[in-house]
Amino acid sequence: MNEDIKNNLNNSDESNGKIIVGLDEAGRGPVIGPMVIASVKINEKDLPRLDDLGLRDSKQLSKKKREELYTKISEICDVKKVVINPEKIDEQMEIINLNKIELGAFSKLANHFIKENENISIYIDACSSNEQSFSNQFKAKLINKNVEIIAEHKADENYKIVSAASIIAKVTRDNVIEEYKKTFGEIGSGYPSDPKTKKFLKNYVHENKGLPKIARKSWATSKNLLKEIEESKIFQWVK
C-alpha cells in the first residue's frame, strides 16, 4: 500500500472537543487502476465549516465540483489516504477477499488517528451487506476498542464527514486515471461496464498478448480476455 499523507488542518486545540473521522473508498469495482481509501478528520466544533460546503456523495457531483471541494476539504480537515495499486490488489486477492482488503486499509487509517486522540467517533461507509458484522470486524482491528463507530450503508450520503472522505478518495483515483491516460491513451473510467475501458483492454491484450500493469488481473474481465488469447492460440495451432 502506498500512503499519501496530507496534514493541513487548522491548528485548533483538539483537546477541547471530540474528534470526528470519516472513512470511504473509491475504485472498489474497476478493472483498471487503484482502490483509494480516504480518511478525513475534524474537530467536532468545526463541523459547521463542512456543512457550509454543501457536501454530497462524490458520485452525485460533477468532476469540476469534486475538485473544488477537494481543495476546500483539505484546507479544513486533516486528510490521509491509502492508495492500493492493481498489483497489490491482485496479490492480496489470492489470500483474502476485497472486503478484507478494504477493512485493512480502513483500520490502518483509523488507528493513525486513534493513536493521537481518545475522544473520537468514526463514521464509515460499510462495504459489507451486514452492517453489524462489518462494524465488529472493523472494531477488532482497532487499537482502542472503546471508540464510537458508526458503520452504515450509504454513509457517504447521510453524513457530511463521510461525503468529504468520498470526495477525497474519488478525486485521488481520478487523478491517477488521468496519469494513466498520458501513457496509455484513452482508457475510459476503468470500470468493466465502460465501453472505452473494454475497447482499450481488448486492443491492448490482442496487441501485446497480455494485460497492462494498470489492470487488475484477478478481475473476471481480465481473465476472460486472457482466456480469449489462449483459445485463439489453440485455434491457430489446430488450424
Curated annotation (Swiss-Prot):
Its main location: cytoplasm. It comes from Methanococcus maripaludis (strain C5 / ATCC BAA-1333). It is found in: Cytoplasm. It comes from the Archaea. A divalent metal cation binds at D24, E25, D125. One of its GO terms (molecular function) is manganese ion binding. The lineage of its organism: Archaea, Methanobacteriati, Methanobacteriota, Methanomada group, Methanococci. Keywords: Cytoplasm, Endonuclease, Hydrolase, Manganese, Metal-binding, Nuclease. GO terms for cellular component: cytoplasm; ribonuclease H2 complex. This is Ribonuclease HII. Its EC number is 3.1.26.4. GO terms for biological process: DNA replication, removal of RNA primer; mismatch repair. Manganese or magnesium. Binds 1 divalent metal ion per monomer in the absence of substrate. May bind a second metal ion after substrate binding. Gene3D superfamilies: Ribonuclease H-like superfamily/Ribonuclease H (3.30.420.10), Ribonuclease hii. Domain 2 (1.10.10.460). The gene is rnhB. Endonuclease that specifically degrades the RNA of RNA-DNA hybrids. It is an enzyme of class 3 (hydrolase). Belongs to the RNase HII family. It catalyses: Endonucleolytic cleavage to 5'-phosphomonoester.
